[in-house]
């Protein structure tokens, strides 16, 4: 059994699978939480309770006792960078040891001393100046270089997660993940990743941005404004409580004012306590402005990092905010590029229909991501191949 927990700002989701390779869902749970803000734990007790409730749901559905979990998270505390690891190999064939050395050097060159490594993802290898090599094993050369994408977070972040999961709930954490890796795994095709594409995952607390090119991740960034920012804009402009703003956003929100009807919605003014009405057009104008700010931030980030010309496949948006009516039209207008909504790609096994929603892209994709890593480890450990050795080294480093 494999259990994955996704710690989101608005919810703690967990999934239990009994066959990762076939994506057979044994149980799934999603529980609201008040203990996380913008991806960071702000209340140990509340977060622990949400985790406990979610795990309890899984155990009741499956009849299994869960002892070990894999934890995925995002948040402003996550950073990333691209790094290089050069090694001199002499005039000989590239060996597993050479590749491990290159990866090790790349993973230690740019990670700040107060951070801890979360993921090491090879972008490409370069042998004697020749780029674009996915597997240099056995090639002849003098100099090998590994180009990698590193994702890291503060040690305190891991400590707080460990406290909620291991100390309070008595569960063992097997692996930590940056949840955006999962979202990309089940919403993007290999062709899109090869050509060059940007994935925008707009959750409740943060917007996660990743770019894939040449089949590999080459850029990632966590941005501070997301679904809660839209909710706050509605609450402030209409002078209503946040919970009511969230409710009407989900039920009546529209990303393009021109698409909204003139239906009148009942709301309660928080200042006077009096009931009043607002049209869906006015609501849509507020939503459109807030979402425009979020997407503009994403587009500017892509342009500022020189990536605009490297994403000919355009943009894919996922996460809970992708459920907003009209978001594709707004994205098309703003990017002047291909802009689509990313849904989890699964084999539609029993109990999984509820997962085919943008808000569950990360946790569904993490199942695929985890299964791939396990398959690599098994296959190459059996043959003592390079990937198995690299996976083993990365696990020991993380």
Residue positions per predicted region:
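Glycine-rich phosphate-binding loop of actin/hexokinase-like ATP-binding domains
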Residues: 195-237
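Short glycine/serine/threonine-rich phosphate/pyrophosphate-binding segments
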Residues: 12, 184-185, 202-210, 324-325
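A short beta-alpha structural unit
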Residues: 186, 313-320
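Gly/Ser/Thr-rich active-site loops/lids in small-molecule metabolic enzymes
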Residues: 95, 223-236, 328, 335-342
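Extended, folded domain segments that form the structural surfaces/walls around functional sites
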Residues: 6, 189, 201, 293, ...
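Nucleotide-binding motor/catalytic cores of P-loop/tubulin-like NTPases across gene-expression machines
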Residues: 317-368
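Nucleotide/phosphate-binding catalytic cleft detector across ATP-hydrolyzing
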Residues: 1-11, 15-199, 216-218, 227, ...
